[in-house]
Amino acid sequence: MEMASVFTLNVRLDNIAIITIDVPGEKMNTLKAEFASQVRAIIKQLRENKELRGVVFVSAKPDNFIAGADINMIGNCKTAQEAEALARQGQQLMAEIHALPIPVIAAIHGACLGGGLELALACHGRVCTDDPKTVLGLPEVQLGLLPGSGGTQRLPRLIGVSTALEMILTGKQLRAKQALKLGLVDDVVPHSILLEVAVELAKKDRPSSRPLPVRERILAGPLGRALLFKMVGKKTEHKTQGNYPATERILEVVETGLAQGTSSGYDAEARAFGELAMTPQSQALRSIFFASTDVKKDPGSDAPPAPLNSVGILGGGLMGGGIAYVTACKAGLPVRIKDINPQGINHALKYSWDQLEGKVRRRHLKASERDKQLALISGTTDYRGFAHRDLIIEAVFENLELKQQMVAEVEQNCAAHTIFASNTSSLPIGDIAAHATRPEQVIGLHFFSPVEKMPLVEIIPHAGTSAQTIATTVKLAKKQGKTPIVVRDKAGFYVNRILAPYINEAIRMLTEGERVEHIDAALVKFGFPVGPIQLLDEVGIDTGTKIIPVLEAAYGERFSAPANVVSSILNDDRKGRKNGRGFYLYGQKGRKSKKQVDPAIYPLIGAQGQGRLSAPQVAERCVMLMLNEAVRCVDEQVIRSVRDGDIGAVFGIGFPPFLGGPFRYIDSLGAGEVVAIMQRLATQYGSRFTPCERLVEMGARGESFWKTTATDLQ
């Protein structure tokens, strides 16, 4: 069967060739190896037509140019040589486009990422739209890879080595105006005249490359380059803790191209691409990418979602303010906040103002757009304006009677179809719905703080929640830009349940004499964004430890915190960053001062701060308990699948993405090895390390999680 055309060539009367990119049946244009023959055939036609004056690449998709290469191609490669051959094919194709004797212009609207930007870089000029959907970047590092079709060589020469390194090492995406300022594009225009401007540019001589700023020219020279790569290398090593091999290879490949010329650079790029594609880190990061894409397509239930036209929020605190912001500014839905105190409403409104004003200051948003988004948020101290809200999110104090009262008030003051979604982090949803007239419309919707930054939400139906309520709540979470996982209504749900033993063990090691900074550094080295003690300080010691007695009551002794430690800390008025003192001491608000461990913490908890454990031993104790609890959650069907378990841990806790999540990590170690480690730890430190039955059985049978299908919740 012949492949449908992805690249279509049309020659206009003014002898400008328009190449339209449109992958049939797909929302996004992605590049595949099998498209190469089509592109080569078009290049041949372009070379043969001596009348042509220029070429323009444009997308037929409404919101993307090319979103990147199809990642499945890499998964299909069995060896580094096969992946390297893919990169060389891409490089060759881009070189052929660049070698055309007439001007070639990329007309960019929407996402222009990865292989899409590499194609645009191979063109002689680039024009993009001023639309917010238009972003340009090379995000391959987020998949444990580097740009493999010439991006590591072309970008530094176009915009300068230090700017290019920042883009390639972080996967940072640029908006149109930023791209113009850096010289990545030649013009930014309204969408309506994009093609017209690109055609006019194609009629001129090839756009001459803009001279680089003096700083960039110095940094490209031998002395500047040596200094730059040394500094960037140090900074990158500190940030990645050596856990992401792609960053090291990016530096090596870019430097090779600058020092030895593009031919050596392209060769190094293709070779590094092939080798990185085979690393366990890249395989894990790609698995997270596929799993999150899969979760985003999951409707949550078989029922169709109800319409969502407006939302109400109860409580104007930190969580209420954050939820209002993502509902209005990401989902674009009108939001009405109810708080018993006008100050609460003002606080919530200021939260959105601060977020949007920050964007205006950074020139990511126009002031008029800020005002338009703010106009979606209103407040009240009673239920006026709540009568026709489709969904109410409750974000009041963690008090069961108060939340039950909120359910009763919403049922009395809102419509018969209104859904009540509680942002509780610890109370059973079934208990919150216990006295509801319409319990089928009560559900949990657990956000993580800070709401605008944390990508995960847990959606928690109780036994009586309807399928439509689940589907509607999932729909809202996606509109808010969140990745939702549906979890069972059991104490701690999923994320807090696997996090609690991890933090408990860190506190226990403190009481045994380990130092605060040693414990935190060990887990950062392992791959977490912050250590467990710092995390507790950031969340708030009072807030973070509130769930421990709930979990201990539900699951027993393995969740108990070291005796009297938490109460001693809280009785000493230590809440963490929010009041300036926890395990660490913080400088005055508004001043940039480094946090420091408070030495007074050790006598307070009856410890010496003179531990003997190595960093791997510290990490092992915390992480093994988290893995064991995650397996219990699959076994008890708290999560619907290991996919959701991995996504929940990576997006909700910051479990190291390069390990792929708890279940991928268990698979990489082998269940038998995890059981052996836990049995050793149980002998040394106590029964809380006893591996759960499911893990022991899988170890004995040599089974893996990702090769077995987790049973869906009924």
Swiss-Prot record:
The record's EC number reads 4.2.1.17, 5.1.2.3, 1.1.1.35
Q: Which reaction does it catalyse?
A: a (3S)-3-hydroxyacyl-CoA = a (2E)-enoyl-CoA + H2O; a 4-saturated-(3S)-3-hydroxyacyl-CoA = a (3E)-enoyl-CoA + H2O; a (3S)-3-hydroxyacyl-CoA + NAD(+) = a 3-oxoacyl-CoA + NADH + H(+); (3S)-3-hydroxybutanoyl-CoA = (3R)-3-hydroxybutanoyl-CoA
Q: What is its main location?
A: cytoplasm
Site, as annotated: Important for catalytic activity: 118, 140
Q: Which GO MF terms does the UniProt record name?
A: 3-hydroxybutyryl-CoA epimerase activity; enoyl-CoA hydratase activity; long-chain-3-hydroxyacyl-CoA dehydrogenase activity; NAD+ binding
Pathway in which this enzyme or protein is active: Lipid metabolism; fatty acid beta-oxidation
List the signal peptide residues.
none
Give the keywords, sorted.
Answer: Cytoplasm, Fatty acid metabolism, Isomerase, Lipid degradation, Lipid metabolism, Lyase, Multifunctional enzyme, NAD, Oxidoreductase
This protein's record includes keyword Zinc: no
A GO cellular component term found in this entry reads:
cytoplasm
**Protein function:** Catalyzes the formation of a hydroxyacyl-CoA by addition of water on enoyl-CoA. Also exhibits 3-hydroxyacyl-CoA epimerase and 3-hydroxyacyl-CoA dehydrogenase activities.
Under which name does UniProt file this protein? Answer: Fatty acid oxidation complex subunit alpha
What gene is behind this protein? fadJ
